Amino acid sequence: MDMTKQIVDFEIKSELIGEIDQFEASDYTMAPPEEPKMVEESPQLGHLEDQNRKYSPEREVEPTLQDPSEVVDQMQKDTESVGEVKSPEKDVETELVKSKASPMNDQALTPPPRPLTSSEVVGLRDPEHTELRMCLEAKKSRSLPVSPQPQPNLKLAGSALFEFGQRSSPVETKIKTNPETKPPRRKIVPPSGEGQQFCLRWNNYQSNLTNVFDELLQSESFVDVTLSCEGHSIKAHKMVLSACSPYFQALFYDNPCQHPIIIMRDVSWSDLKALVEFMYKGEINVCQDQINPLLKVAETLKIRGLAEVSAGRGEGGASALPMSAFDDEDEEEELASATAILQQDGDADPDEEMKAKRPRLLPEGVLDLNQRQRKRSRDGSYATPSPSLQGGESEISERGSSGTPGQSQSQPLAMTTSTIVRNPFASPNPQTLEGRNSAMNAVANQRKSPAPTATGHSNGNSGAAMHSPPGGVAVQSALPPHMAAIVPPPPSAMHHHAQQLAAQHQLAHSHAMASALAAAAAGAGAAGAGGAGSGSGSGASAPTGGTGVAGSGAGAAVGSHHDDMEIKPEIAEMIREEERAKMIESGGHGGWMGAAAAATGAASVAADSYQYQLQSMWQKCWNTNQQNLVQQLRFRERGPLKSWRPEAMAEAIFSVLKEGLSLSQAARKFDIPYPTFVLYANRVHNMLGPSLDGGADPRPKARGRPQRILLGMWPEELIRSVIKAVVFRDYREIKEDMSAHQYANGQGHGTYIGGGTTTNGYHSAAAAKLAAQNAALAPPDAGSPLSSMTETLRRQILSQQQQHQQHHQQQAHHQQQPSHHQQQSPHAQSMNMYKSPAYLQRSEIEDQVSAAAAVAAAAAKHQQQQGERRGSENLPDLSALGLMGLPGLNVMPSRGSGGGSGGAAPNSAASYARELSRERERDRERERERELSRQYGSQSRGSSSGSGSAKSLTASQRPGAASPYSAAHYAKHQASAYNKRFLESLPAGIDLEAFANGLLQKSVNKSPRFEDFFPGPGQDMSELFANPDASAAAAAAAYAPPGAIRESPLMKIKLEQQHATELPHED
C-alpha cells in the first residue's frame, strides 16, 4: 500500500491540474478539510440522480470532488470513526483543484461503460445538497451488485481508487479490498500538476473474489446471517446475499442486527442451498424438475441472475434497494419518509422532483432521497432541513422516518417467506438510540403514512415518541393514544398506525401489544397481508404501494434499534393469533405495561388471561429476540416476568389442599403458570410434613390423576404458616388473622372467615349455595382476582354475619358464651379437612362424621365435667366441619350448636351412638389382635402390628381420655403416633364411626359406596358385641388391612372402605 500511495502522491503532484476536467473528481481531489464530513456522504450517487436532476456545473464540480472521498469516507466512517486523514499538502491541493475544477468538471464525468448497477445508482437528490456525482466504473461484478453496505463495500473498486490519493494512512486503504487491484478506469487528476496516473489492474479479480467468497462460505468464516428452512440452516454473508438480492438487501437493511437468523417459509432446503450456491458461485447444476420451483423461489427472493430483478427500477438496474450502509439505521425510516414525502408533500420543489421520478420513486426513489438525506444528517454538515421533508423538518427527522426498501411492492409475498429471528446476542445498533430518532420517527410516521390522515395519528404518536428515552423502554410509554382505540383507522392511517405501534412496541414486553395491535390494525384488513405482517407498521405501507414491507422502520427509531421492532410479515400468523388476545390488557397488571396503558389511556381490553398474554409476549420475545439485550437475556434465562401475586398463589395452594382442586385446575383458576404453581405447591406440600390421616395417599392414584393432586389433612394454621413461609417469603406477611385473607375464590375456608360460621369450601349444600351466591355477587367487572376476591369476601362476610345472628337467636339458649365463637379449638381446626369435590362422596361422610362426632363428644365431655353447664366455648366449630346439611343440625350451625341432637343431653342420640361405637371399636380391636396373633403365631415377630398386643389388652381397658381408639390400636399402629397425640387433645369419646351410624344417612344417596362401610356379614350398625372391646377389635380385624399403619380416627372409615372395595379397583 505504501508504495502505491507514494506512486499516487507522486502522480498527484505531477499531474496537471488542467486535466481535471477529464476526470471525475478523484479522491485526491478530495473535498477540503472543512468538508470531511460531507465527504462521507454519498457513495451512492447514481445515475438515477443524473437522470432526474438538472445540475448546475458548479454543483457538479463539488460533488465530483467530494464524491469519491465521500465513498471513502463513508467506508472510513464505517470502519473507524475517524475523519479523513489527509496530508496537508493534499489538502492544499484539493483546494486548488476544487477551485479550478469547478468550472470544468461539469462535463468531466466519464460515462460508465454500462448502466450502473444499483449500487452505483442510488444518489442523493437534494438540490441544496451538494451532491457528488459518482460514477465510478470500477469493474464490478454484475452478479454481485450491492448490499446495504455496499455502497461503500462494493464500490470498493472506485473507492479504493480514490483511496490511494486520499488517504494518507494505510489503515484506511486497507479497508478497500485490494485497492491496487482496482483499475481506476477514469483518469484521476491529482491536484498538483503532475498529470499522469497508472492503472493497476488485477486481471482475475472477479474470479478471485468469487472464489474467496465461496471459500468463506464453506469455512463459515465471517458469516453474519443464518438462513434456515425445514430444520436445516446455512450460514452466509449479508454482503453477498445483499449483493445478489434486493430482497435480502432490504431485509438486512430493515433489520440491522449483528447476526439475524432468517427462517424461510415455503422454501425447500434443496432450493435454498442451491440459491446460496448460485449467489456465491454464479452457477449451479439442477435437475429439470427442480428448475421451476427453484426459479419461483429465486423470484420471491429476487435473486439477480435468476429472476428479473432490476426491471422497472431506476435506470441502472435495481436501484431500489436501500443502498445503505448499515450504520445508518435510520434509512428505513428515511425511506418511508421519502415515500411520505412523495405523497404528502405540498412543497413544489420536492414535488417536481418527484414527478420526474415518481414511478420509480415510490419505493426506490425514496431510497435515494433518504439516502441523500440520511447521509446528510449523518454527516451533520448538511443538517439543514430539506424542503422536501414535510413541514420542513430536518433530515434528522427524515432519518427517523421509516424508509423501507423500495422492493416492497413486489415484496410482500417474498417477505412472507422469511422470518428474521434476532440473534440474542446481537448488540443493538446504537445509533438509533439517539433521542433524535424519536423525533424522526414521529416525522417519519407522518411522512410515511400515505395519506394525511395518517399524519394526524402520527403526530399523536410522535409526541409520545419524542420523549421516549433511547432505551426501548420508553417506547412503551410512547404508545400513541390513538392506539388505544383498537378501531383500525383507515388504511392509510393504519399502516402507520402499525408503524407507530411498532415503534412503541419495541419494548420487549410491548411486543405482544404491538403485534396484537398491529394485528388488529392489519387484521382490520386495511393493510392486507403486507400490513398485517409487520407489526412494525411496515405492513401499513401496503396501501401505499411503496414501502410495504420495510415499513418496520418508522417506529424503530423510537426506542431502540430496529431489532426491537421487528415483527415481520412473516410473523403475521403469530400476530393473527394474538389478535385473539385482542390487545394486551393495558391496564391492570402491575407496572408491567402500565406505562403503555397510561399513555394509551384506553380501557383495558380484556383479553385471554393475563397469563396467556404474558406467555405469548414472552414467546414472541423468545422467537424474535426483540428486546434490548438485558431484557432479552433475562427472558431467555428466566422465563416471563412473574405474573402472579403471592396472594393468588396462596389461595391457589389453599384451594388445592382444601378444595381438592387438582394442580392444573388451581393454576388455571388463579391464572398462575402451571410449572410455577407446581413448584410452589409441592414445596408447600413437602413442608407440611406428615398428614393427619397418617400420610399415605387415601385416594389410590387412578389413571386419571397421577400426581397432580396434593392430598392429606393438616391443621389449618400449619397450612397457613407454611404457605406464608413459602409464598410470601420475607417480603410479605400474611396477616395473622386469616380472616382478612380469604383463600379460595370467595369461599371462606371455615375457620378463618367470619368466625366459625363459614362453610368449608363447597362441602355442603349450604356452602355450595353460598359459593354460588358469592359468584353471583362478585362484581362482573372485577378486574383482578384480588379485587373480586375482596369484594366477594366482603359480601360473604356480610351474609355470614346475618346467618350468624340468626343462629345466635335460635341457639342462644345453647350458648351461654357466644363471645367465644370466634375461637376455634385447635382440634376443631385440624379436623377441618378440606376434601375435594372429586371425592365428595367419601370426604363428605368423613367430614360430617368427624364433625358430628366432635360435637357430640365435646358435649358429652362437658357434660361429664360440668353437668350443670353446657359451655359452648369448647365445642368444636361444626361449621368448619362441613356439617352443614346434616339432619339434626341447623344449616349454618354456629360453634356451639350441636344441633338439636348433639348438644343437648348425654342421653341424646349422639351420646348413645358414641357409647355404642366405642364398644364396637373395642371389640374390633380385640378381635383383631386375636386374629393377628393367630396369623403370626407369636408376637416375637416384632411387627408393629402385632407387637404390643398383650400389653395393649390391659391398656385398652382404660383408653386415654380423648382417644377414640383403644391403646391397642396405637400399639399396632405406631405410625399414628402423631395422630394419637392429636387425638388425645380431642374431647373424650369422639367416635367417628358411631356418628357414621346415625348421621351418614344423609349421604347415603350421594355415596354409592355406603354399603362398603358395613360390609361384614353381620356387622352392621345394629350389631353390638357383648364385650365392647372385643367388638371393636373384631371390627378392626374385619375391616382393616392387616398391615395398615395409616389408620387414624379421621380416616378409619375411609380406610376400611378402601380396603374392602377399592383394592380390586386399583389400576
Swiss-Prot record:
Mitochondrion among keywords: no
DNA-binding listed as a keyword: yes
Pfam families: BTB (PF00651), HTH_psq (PF05225)
Keywords: DNA-binding, Nucleus, Phosphoprotein, Transcription, Transcription regulation
Chain residue ranges for the region called Disordered: 30-121, 312-412, 444-505, 525-563, 796-829, 860-879, 891-967
Superkingdom of source: Eukaryota
Gene3D superfamilies per the UniProt record, alphabetical: Potassium Channel Kv1.1, Chain A (3.30.710.10)
PANTHER family, per the entry: BTB DOMAIN TRANSCRIPTION FACTOR, FI07618P-RELATED
Name assigned to this protein: Protein bric-a-brac 2
Organism: Drosophila melanogaster
Gene name, Swiss-Prot/TrEMBL: bab2
